[in-house]
Amino acid sequence: MVRAITLLLLISLHSIQAFADNTVVVQTKGSGSSITVQQVGSGNVTGVYCGLGSFDSSLVNTHNCDNATIGVSIDGSSNIAYAQSVWSNHDSQVWSITVDGNDNYAVIDMDQDDNTATIIQNGNDNDALILGSGNNNVYKIEQTGDDMYAKFQTFADNSDIWSTQEGTGNHNVFVFNSNQADNNSTRVIQKGSGNKDADIFWYND
């Protein structure tokens, strides 16, 4: 079991503002890991890799990452958050990325069975992407603000995809479920003024 907690803050006491440009990379393996990363400010990059990672183009060998809980919290603008587990021995995980601010990009790449991935973004011009494979998974993206984009790309059976977008401006949701994917469901809710668009593609056996 691994427990990692990272908190990065750079605060000016005179201006009460946060500045950043920090990079955090967490690579771990093993069952029952608990990882929490919090960043405040702008221009930060966060990468969390459980079981296998390729943040710097070098790979960690595939290992068990069952029953992991991974949480990333971002407060600021122009940040990137990326969380990944790949292909094998990665069941019963809970992944979450929470973002407050504008122009942020969040990705969860999660594989295997009985997992939950959630991205929550509050602000404007934010993008979110969830990639997943395996069975009996739940994928959620919740966005509040102006001009949001959400994308789901899955290779899964018996899974649920939920997207909620609220606010003014242009919102877009893209859902793609690949060939040989059965018994899945999609729920898309879009509220507010402006253009709303949803593209949903299902392919079964």
Language-model features: locations:
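Sec/Tat signal peptide C-region and signal peptidase I cleavage site
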Residues: 5, 13-20
